[in-house]
Swiss-Prot record:
N-acetylmethionine found at: 1
GO cellular component: cytoplasm
Its job: Catalyzes the phosphorolytic breakdown of the N-glycosidic bond in the beta-(deoxy)ribonucleoside molecules, with the formation of the corresponding free purine bases and pentose-1-phosphate. Preferentially acts on 6-oxopurine nucleosides including inosine and guanosine.
InterPro entries, per database record: Nucleoside_phosphorylase_d (IPR000845), Nucleoside_phosphorylase_sf (IPR035994), Pur_Nuc_Pase_Ino/Guo-sp (IPR011270), Purine_phosphorylase (IPR011268), Purine_phosphorylase-2_CS (IPR018099)
Location of the protein in the cell: Cytoplasm
Domain of life: Eukaryota
Family (UniProt): Belongs to the PNP/MTAP phosphorylase family.
UniProt binding sites for a purine D-ribonucleoside: 88, 201, 219, 243, 257
Protein name: Purine nucleoside phosphorylase
Modified residues (Phosphoserine): 251
Pathway: Purine metabolism; purine nucleoside salvage
Residues annotated as binding phosphate: 33, 64, 84-86, 116, 220
Source organism of the structure: Bos taurus (Bovine)
Subunit structure: Homotrimer.
Amino acid sequence: MANGYTYEDYQDTAKWLLSHTEQRPQVAVICGSGLGGLVNKLTQAQTFDYSEIPNFPESTVPGHAGRLVFGILNGRACVMMQGRFHMYEGYPFWKVTFPVRVFRLLGVETLVVTNAAGGLNPNFEVGDIMLIRDHINLPGFSGENPLRGPNEERFGVRFPAMSDAYDRDMRQKAHSTWKQMGEQRELQEGTYVMLGGPNFETVAECRLLRNLGADAVGMSTVPEVIVARHCGLRVFGFSLITNKVIMDYESQGKANHEEVLEAGKQAAQKLEQFVSLLMASIPVSGHTG
């Protein structure tokens, strides 16, 4: 099925939010598994449960609280999704990405995406942060794309380019900010590949993905980025490496969601501090920063 939402549905949700808060966000942040603690850094926070927002889907995954939080972070007016939606929850991509178009109508200019991911690159360690340089949309190979169906010209063009999906200037600023933090581990950078889930990958799949050039694997992020770029948002994002994928048939290890959440808890503070510092570097209308 193509998009089940009309332009008016996006408008209605945006109008509802604008009538229930005086805040006007410039930056939207999607918090991945176990990374929702970033909202605790917001000042003047105002929270809405997804269930009370017209047309909003609801998050069903542990580690995803299901709240939309408005507030100020390091001088930037933000709206944060404390919990995202996934294909494996049964949602089509047009529902997964519904909030992104709403953010555009709220006046958001930049989308920051975060996720928990498995490390395919052998140089990555658990707890590393990978700046996303590019992505591979594996579901797209079989026609699963959030832009499938009639194009909504009021958001963007029929055939948007994705070669520059992740903003180069913000990636450079991210490296500078990381150096200022003085972390021992370097900030990684690489390609994120999305699978549908909910099962974790087989050994053969992991080997294939690595051969395709992917550095980290997860079950989210890509559809939101595609829709964000379609409607003209600046995008950058990070993967928190919460486990190293199994590449060896002799290995006794197994990936599990509890491990992902625990690793997220341990490293989340570092990522939250990083995103908070980086927020001041995000250009907004009327500012040069």
